[in-house]
C-alpha cells in the first residue's frame, strides 16, 4: 500500500513537471530570434530541430526528477541513480546550449562568432558533449557486470558515492580542458598554430572521444560472451525479435500491464542499443572531423550534423525509462489515470458542462 502511494505521488510530480516543462519548451521554440530565416532550408531544419530538442529536454527532465526522487527517498542502489541523474542533467544542458546556438545564428553567420556569449556557449556545448560520452561509459561498465564472481572488476558493481563523485569531478575537469583546447583551435586561425599543431590537436581530440567508445565496445563484448557461455547463441538479437521489441515499446502504454522481461532479453536489448548509440556518435564525429580538417562550412552539412548530434540525447532517456520497471509502471499509471482517451474525454465533458452553467 505504501509503495502504491509513493508511485502515485511520483506520478503527480511527473505530471506537474511535464506541464511546466512543455510550457517552457514552447516558449523556447516560438520566441527564438528570426536571424536564421535567411539560411537556405532553415524551415525544414526548424521542423526537425525544435520538436526534437523539446522532446529530449522533456524526457530527460522526467528521468532526472525520478532518479533524484529515488536517490533521496528510496533504498535502491544509489550509484546507478547518481549516474543516470548526472547523464540526464548533461543531456538537458546539451540540448539547451544547442538551442541557444541555433537561436543566435551561430552556424550561419560569421559575425556572431566574435561575440563572447557565443564563445561561452560553444565551450559549454563542447563540455556537455564530452560528458555525454564519458558518463554512459561508466554506466555501461556497471551494467555489464552480470556475474560478479567471474568478472575481475566485481568490486565496481556497487561503487560508493565518493567514487562516483570522484569520477564526475575527473570527467568535468578533463572535458573542460578539452573544451579549452577545442575553442582555441576554433577561434585562432591555423597560421598561428601551424600545420603540425593542428594535426596533433585533431589526433588528441580523436583519442579523447575514442577511448570511452572503445570501453563501451569491450564491455558489450564481455556481456555478449558471458551470455553466450551461459545461455547459448543469442538468436533473439537478430531479425524479427528486435522489430517485436520496438513494436512492444511503442504499444506498451496501450496495455494495462506488461509481461516481465528476462535478464537475457534485457541484456541483449542493451547491447543493440548501446552499439547503435556508438554508431550515432561515430557519424557525428566523422562530420566534425571532416569539417575541422577541410575547413568547409556547408550549411546543410552543419544542420545535418546538429540533428544527428542531438539524437542520442533524445533517444537515450526513452531507453532508460523503458529499462526501469518502476519508472515504466509510474508512467503507465499516469497514462491510465490522466492521459488515456476516456479520461481526457471525461475531463473535456466536465469542462464543457461547467462553461454551460
Swiss-Prot record:
SUPFAM superfamilies: Family A G protein-coupled receptor-like. The chain crosses the membrane at residues 4-24, 53-73, 82-102, 131-151, 164-184, 270-290, 301-321. GO terms for biological process: response to pheromone. It is found in: Cell membrane. The keyword Iron-sulfur does not apply. It is a multi-pass membrane protein. It holds the Pfam family V1R. Keywords: Cell membrane, G-protein coupled receptor, Glycoprotein, Membrane, Pheromone response, Receptor, Transducer, Transmembrane, Transmembrane helix. Residues 25-52, 103-130, 185-269, 322-357 are cytoplasmic. GO terms for cellular component: plasma membrane. Glycans are attached at residue 297. It comes from the Eukaryota. The keyword Glycoprotein applies. Residues 1-3, 74-81, 152-163, 291-300 are extracellular. GO terms for molecular function: pheromone receptor activity. Belongs to the G-protein coupled receptor 1 family. Putative pheromone receptor. This is Vomeronasal type-1 receptor 5. It comes from Gorilla gorilla gorilla (Western lowland gorilla). The gene is VN1R5.
